[in-house]
């Protein structure tokens, strides 16, 4: 179970780093704002679910 938690935490950290780069780039691109808005929304929701999942795994370990 500890390995699953560590992998989930690593994925969360890497995804967070990806969002740190991707979100400002998407905000700065003026073209196709509706698509960028949807990508940011889905990416943020996925991040929240990952944080909750890591929290649950942390509680279970």
Swiss-Prot record:
Pfam families: Ycf9. The chain crosses the membrane at residues 8-28, 41-61. GO terms for cellular component: photosystem II reaction center; plasma membrane-derived thylakoid membrane. It is found in: Cellular thylakoid membrane. GO terms for biological process: photosynthesis; photosystem II stabilization. Keywords: Membrane, Photosynthesis, Photosystem II, Reaction center, Thylakoid, Transmembrane, Transmembrane helix. It is a multi-pass membrane protein. Belongs to the PsbZ family. HAMAP family: PSII_PsbZ. PANTHER family: PHOTOSYSTEM II REACTION CENTER PROTEIN Z. PSII is composed of 1 copy each of membrane proteins PsbA, PsbB, PsbC, PsbD, PsbE, PsbF, PsbH, PsbI, PsbJ, PsbK, PsbL, PsbM, PsbT, PsbX, PsbY, PsbZ, Psb30/Ycf12, peripheral proteins PsbO, CyanoQ (PsbQ), PsbU, PsbV and a large number of cofactors. It forms dimeric complexes. May control the interaction of photosystem II (PSII) cores with the light-harvesting antenna, regulates electron flow through the 2 photosystem reaction centers. PSII is a light-driven water plastoquinone oxidoreductase, using light energy to abstract electrons from H(2)O, generating a proton gradient subsequently used for ATP formation. This is Photosystem II reaction center protein Z. It comes from Synechococcus sp. (strain JA-2-3B'a(2-13)) (Cyanobacteria bacterium Yellowstone B-Prime). The lineage of its organism: Bacteria, Bacillati, Cyanobacteriota, Cyanophyceae, Synechococcales. The gene is psbZ.
């Amino acid at each position: 179970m500890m390995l699953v938690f560590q992998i989930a935490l690593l994925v969360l950290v890497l995804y967070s780093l990806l969002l740190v780069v991707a979100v400002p780039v998407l905000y700065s691109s003026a073209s196709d704002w509706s698509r960028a808005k949807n990508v940011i929304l889905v990416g943020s929701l996925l991040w929240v679910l990952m944080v909750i999942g890591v929290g649950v795994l942390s509680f279970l370990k």
